[in-house]
Each structure stands twice: as C-alpha cells, then as structure tokens.
C-alpha cells in the first residue's frame, strides 16, 4: 500500500532538521489521555535502573560507531496514511510509524489534533501527494531486516531495551513497589554499614589508648624493678670491683675490661615458690596449736583435782583413812617446860609465828569442821570428830610433862594448863558464860568411875579462873550423876604403833631437847611438826628411822587412862545461844567418849546420858 507524502504548509523546517529522527511521544493516545495513562506512562520506558541510580548497564555507542540509518533516509519524505475528514476541526490522524532511531526500534501511535483546512486547501495538497508503492514495500522489508539484525546483536551483548506498548497494570504496580522497596533496603543497609564502621573505629581508638596505658605502666614497673635490683645489689655488694691488670707486653695504656654480665638491668623472671614449704609451716602450726590446747586442757583437768594449798593443814596417816576431813585448828602447846631454852613469859594461847605457819592466819573463833562416821544400828552415823586429833596430841604433851611435874599436880591439871582453848568463849565475864563454864570441867577419873571429889574439881575451877585461862576442852557437868559401866558401850578402838599410817606418840621432852637442833623457838606448831618430834624419829620412809621410832616407843612408860575428847551427835544438837560456843537448850541423849588406855590404845565409847535437872552437855 502506498503511503502518501504529506506536505505540511503550516510548519516550516529548515534543511538541517528535515532528516533528524525525532523520538515519538510516549503516550499511547494523546487525544484520549487520562490520569491512568499519565500514571503508567513512565512504566513504558523499560530502563532498569540500579539502586545506586547509575547508568552502567546502559549501552551507548562509541564515536566511531555509526547510527543505524538507512541509506535512503535522506531521500525519504514524511509520509503517512492520511484519511480525509468532512471539514470538521479536530480530525484525528492515526499515524503508525516505525523508525530506527539510534539503533532502537520504536513503535508509536500518535494522534495529532490540528485545524482542518478548508476544502480548497485540502484539494490542493492532495494533488501534490505522490504514491510510490514499490518504494514503500522495499523500505519496509529493509527496516524489518535491520531491526532483526540489531535485536540479534543486542541480545548477544546482554542488553535488550525494547519498550512494549501496553502492559498489564498489576505487573506495573508490582514493579513500582519492588523498586521502592529496593531503594529503601539499600538506604538502610548503607546506614547500618555506616554505624558499624563508626563503632569499629571507636573500639579501635579505645584499644589503642588501653595499649598505650599498659605500655606506660609496664615501662614504669620495669624501671622501678631495675632501681630496686640496683639498691639490693649495692646493699649486699661484696666490695669494690677489681682494678684492671696491666700486662707487661701491652704497649698501650690499660683499658677497662668489660665485666661478666651486662650492665643493662634484666627483666625480672617470675619464679614459683615451692608449695611444700608452706604446707610444712601450716602443719607445724597446727601441731603446735593442738599441743598447747592439750596441755592447757590437762592443766585445767588435773588442777581441779589437785588441792594446791601452801602451808595448809595436811591430813596425817590414820586421819585420812578413818575420818573424812580434818580442817580444825591445831592446838598450840607452848610453855617454858616444853621448850628447851624457851622464853618463860610466853602465853599458852598465842598463835604460831609467821615463820612456822605458812598458811593464812585464821580466826580463833572459827568453828571446827570435822566429821567421823561411826557404825550405829547397822548404819553409818556422821559425828563431829575433829577434836580427836587434838586430844591425841594433847595427851602426848601431857605424858611428857608428867615426868617433870615438880608440884605434884594431877595429869589433867597439867593438861588443862598447857592446852589452848579449842572452842573459845566470846566473853568470860558475862553471867551466862560464867554459869555455863562451871559445868565444862571435871577430872578424868570422875567421868569414868562416876565417883570423885568435889574438892579437886573446885580447886581446878578456881585455879583456872584465877589464871584467866578458861579451859573448854571437855563439856561435862560438874555436879550430878556421871557415867556408869552399864551406860557405855564400846564402838571401836585402834592402837598407836610405829608402822606407816599409825599415830606415833611423842618422845619424852629430854630426848627432844637432845636430838633437836632448833630449840630456840618459843612456839610449837604440831600441824607442821616444828619441834614436836625429832626429824630423825618422824621420818617413816627409811628403815633406820622406823627402828629408832620403835625403840623410843618401847621406852615410853605406859600412862594412866585418860579421856581425850567427848563428841556429840550433831543431829541431836540445837542452835547455840552464845556466839562462838556450843550450846543449846535441847538436852543430849548420847555422847561419844574417846579414851587413851596405857598410852597405846584409843577406845571410843558410846554412852547414854542421864536426864538431870541441869543439862550436862550442850552442842550446836
């Protein structure tokens, strides 16, 4: 079909612009354009742009590459299918042209709205159109061949930019959404990379600052270690260095020889200390602590059992085995006849001197605390028996003084003069004390045989009161019936022997003066045996001393029987009315009397007391 050539009288183009290929409008139909067509007009350009908005993938021909323009393009005139209308303005001319512009095949469909000329003008122009059907057919075939070759070449190079007219709206929307999403993701990824790089830079800076600080500290420590090593080396240096030796063959002056080792301080090499030494020290400390604690525990354990009392009374032989305790006061026998060369003006009731009494001084009015267990009615009865020991000692002194009694007084009178009170009265001048003291003394014979003389007792009482020394050893009544043989029963007895554990009688006074070197002391303490018995006679650990004691015991003359103590049952005693003495209104029904027979045997009797008007014996 021949295409008519349209000669536009209204538009005048220069010769330079006649053959320039102008890109057609991207709109599908300009006359029927609306909002949807305008919105989708951009999607017709099938240029795929990267996220970084670069045109690296686009193909641009080089300068030497020629455009794909057909050779007869210069002779070609603008032609198109023209359909005349009936003189109505705004006729649409649908012109479909296919041109090869810059090697790109473009298919456009455009609508031109122009003023329709008058009928006269249109007739003039139609006459000037020339139809050449053969030329147009040839031109179409050439254009198709060129376009196929060009598309084939672009496919090989990996670039095909063919814009198709009309597409589905869904595909266009998806492409737009994908493009926006890609751009946003690219922007976010760039921001993340930027922040990550900034954080890495901050960390690197911090690491560099930390490394610099550590290096400075290390250098400081090294320098300090070097100074300390130098100080230690100078402190323990053996002496100045040796002077360099000048050898005779050296023609030049002597030079300093470099000593062994380098002058530069070496870095300290840490050495691990052996662990076994520390373990040994800890083990030694543990053993020492355990031993100390064990020693202290033993001291506390055995210290509580051992009675540590320096200078106190030590129980003697039989008293430990027979009697429970013996804490009573020791009687002091002190007179001019007992001591060899002693002072005659010393009183009977003086205390022991400080050199002889190692224990603390006691009050003379302190009550005697002692006990004696006696079998009675198939039971053991506890009796206050502290006076037995003192009675034995008093009897020994009485027998010694009996041989040298020039005035011919009885044994009991001599004993009462030489004994100090065991239980003193607080005040002898008070009427009540004087009334009680009348019933405290009697002779030994009268107490045993219930027959005696009142004159002897009266003389004894008068002499005692006249001297001011009220003896309170026996607490018996002066008047009234006394004991009979049917009223007393023997409880137990024990002999005085020289064997270990027995009571040894005192030797005569003449032998004590001859055998004792300490004869100038005026006070005698029988508790610590200071002069009462010779040292050689009292030592029972050696056989010769035991034999000498036996000889002295055999030489001792048996004396008459005497009462050494009178004991009462503490269960039958009442509370004392007078301070410091045994007394009470409750009468006693039974007493225990200790008698020394022939100076070698002590017999304890249990006697039943009669019930007179006046109580004979009072106890606390």
From Swiss-Prot:
It is a single-pass membrane protein. Residues 211-218 are annotated as: Leucine-zipper. This is bZIP transcription factor 49. Transcriptional activator involved in stress responses. Glycans are attached at residues 351, 363, 515, 539, 546. Residues 309-620 are lumenal. The keyword Lipoprotein does not apply.
């Amino acid at each position: 079909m021949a295409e008519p050539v349209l000669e536009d009288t209204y538009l005048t183009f220069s010769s330079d612009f006649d053959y320039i290929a102008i890109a057609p409008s991207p709109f599908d139909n300009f006359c029927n354009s609306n909002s949807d067509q305008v919105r989708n007009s951009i999607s017709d350009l099938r240029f795929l742009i990267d996220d970084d908005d670069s045109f690296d993938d686009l193909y641009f021909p080089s300068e030497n590459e020629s455009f794909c323009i057909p050779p007869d393009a210069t002779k070609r005139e603008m032609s198109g299918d023209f359909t005349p209308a009936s003189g109505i303005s705004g006729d649409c001319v649908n012109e479909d042209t296919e041109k090869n512009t810059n090697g790109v095949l473009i298919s456009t469909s455009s609508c031109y709205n122009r003023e329709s000329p008058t009928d006269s003008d249109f007739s003039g122009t139609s006459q000037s159109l020339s139809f050449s059907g053969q030329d147009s057919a040839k031109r179409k075939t050439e254009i198709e061949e060129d376009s196929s070759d060009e598309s084939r070449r672009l496919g090989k190079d990996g670039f095909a930019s063919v814009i198709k007219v009309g597409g589905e709206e869904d595909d266009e929307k998806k492409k737009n959404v994908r493009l926006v999403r890609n751009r946003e993701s690219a922007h976010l990824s760039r921001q993340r990379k930027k922040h990550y790089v900034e954080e890495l830079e901050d960390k690197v800076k911090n690491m560099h600052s930390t490394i610099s600080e550590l290096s400075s500290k290390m250098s400081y420590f090294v320098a300090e270690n070097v100074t300390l090593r130098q100080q230690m080396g100078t402190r323990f240096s053996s002496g100045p260095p040796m002077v360099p030796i000048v050898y005779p063959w050296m023609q030049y002056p002597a030079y300093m020889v470099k000593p062994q080792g380098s002058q530069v301080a070496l870095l300290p090499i840490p050495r691990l200390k052996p662990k076994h030494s520390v373990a040994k020290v800890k083990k030694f400390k543990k053993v020492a602590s355990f031993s100390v604690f064990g020693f202290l525990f033993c001291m506390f354990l055995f210290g509580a059992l051992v009675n540590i009392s320096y200078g106190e009374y030590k129980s003697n032989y039989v008293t430990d085995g027979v009697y429970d305790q013996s804490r009573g006061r020791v009687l002091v026998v002190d007179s001019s006849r007992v001591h060899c060369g002693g002072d005659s003006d010393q009183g009977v009731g003086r205390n022991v001197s400080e050199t002889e009494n190692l224990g603390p001084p006691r009050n003379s009015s302190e009550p005697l605390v002692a006990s004696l267990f006696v079998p009675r009615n198939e039971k053991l009865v506890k009796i206050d028996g502290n006076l037995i020991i003192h009675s034995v000692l008093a009897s020994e002194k009485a027998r010694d003084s009996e041989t040298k009694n020039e005035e011919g007084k009885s044994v009991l009178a001599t004993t009462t003069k030489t004994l100090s009170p065991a239980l003193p009265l607080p005040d002898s001048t008070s009427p009540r004390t004087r009334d009680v003291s009348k019933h405290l003394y009697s002779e030994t014979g009268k107490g045993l045989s219930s027959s005696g003389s009142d004159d002897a007792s009266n003389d004894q009482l008068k002499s005692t009161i006249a001297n001011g020394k009220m003896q309170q050893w026996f607490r018996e009544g002066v008047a009234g019936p006394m004991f009979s043989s049917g009223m007393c029963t023997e409880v137990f007895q024990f002999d005085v022997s020289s064997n270990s554990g027995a009571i040894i009688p005192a030797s005569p006074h003449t032998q004590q003066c001859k055998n004792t070197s300490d004869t100038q002391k005026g006070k005698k303490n029988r508790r610590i045996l200071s002069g009462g018995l010779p040292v050689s006679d009292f030592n029972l650990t050696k056989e010769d001393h035991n034999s000498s004691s036996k000889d002295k015991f055999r030489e001792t003359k048996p004396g008459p029987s005497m009462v050494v103590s009178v004991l009462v049952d503490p269960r039958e005693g009442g509370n004392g009315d007078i301070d410091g003495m045994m007394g009470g209104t409750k009468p006693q029904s039974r007493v225990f009397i200790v008698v020394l027979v022939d100076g070698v045997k002590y017999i304890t009797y249990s006697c039943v007391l009669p019930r007179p008007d006046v109580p004979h014996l009072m106890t606390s």
